[in-house]
Amino acid sequence: MEQTFIAIKPDGVQRGLCGEVMKFIQPMKHYLDLKDMPFYAGLCKYMSSGPVFAMVWEGEGIVKMMLGETNPADSKPGSIRGDFCINIGRNIIHGSDTVENAKMEVGLWFKPEEFVAYAEKAKAWVYE
């Protein structure tokens, strides 16, 4: 079972999309891998401009499919970005791109004791 880090970005929060997608931010650390990109300063400013709704999702290879492509124009209907995004600069949601990055990003935002472990009964009926 894979985990990935998910953050609804400020435009998604401001547009009231947290419920549709199901004031704590560390943009400088979170996007450190992009620090040499020309858009880095603007991205950090944007990610600090309002609250972010952070969470961890778990599933078998479905997270990227549910999010859609980074560019909403390339996202399929039925994905979060395909249904709710306006443009690439305001694509409402961040999702880890690899399992390795997910572990790092989850560690930036959450402490291990903040997770609640529970056995979902339906899981045995859905996953082999």
Swiss-Prot record:
Residues at which ATP binds: 9, 39, 70, 81, 91
GO molecular function term, any single one: metal ion binding
Reactions it catalyzes: a 2'-deoxyribonucleoside 5'-diphosphate + ATP = a 2'-deoxyribonucleoside 5'-triphosphate + ADP; a ribonucleoside 5'-diphosphate + ATP = a ribonucleoside 5'-triphosphate + ADP
Keyword tags: Acetylation, ATP-binding, Cell cycle, Cell projection, Cytoplasm, Kinase, Magnesium, Metal-binding, Nucleotide metabolism, Nucleotide-binding, Nucleus, Phosphoprotein, Transferase
Cystine connections: none
Coiled-coil annotated spans: none
Main subcellular localisation: cytoplasm
Superkingdom assignment: Eukaryota
Matches recorded under PROSITE patterns: NDPK_LIKE
EC number(s) given by UniProt: 2.7.4.6
Nucleus keyword on record: yes
Subcellular location, record wording: Cytoplasm; Nucleus; Cell projection, Lamellipodium; Cell projection, Ruffle
Transmembrane segments annotated in the record for this chain: none
Cofactor: Mg(2+)
PTM sites of type N-acetylmethionine: 1
InterPro entries named in the record: NDK-like_dom, NDK-like_dom_sf
Listed GO CC annotations: cytoplasm; lamellipodium; nucleus; ruffle
Active site per UniProt: 94
Biological-process GO terms, alphabetical: nucleotide metabolic process
Family named by the database record: Belongs to the NDK family.
Function summary: Major role in the synthesis of nucleoside triphosphates other than ATP.
Annotated protein name in UniProt: Nucleoside diphosphate kinase B
Organism: Merluccius bilinearis
Taxonomic placement: Eukaryota, Metazoa, Chordata, Craniata, Vertebrata
Gene: nme2
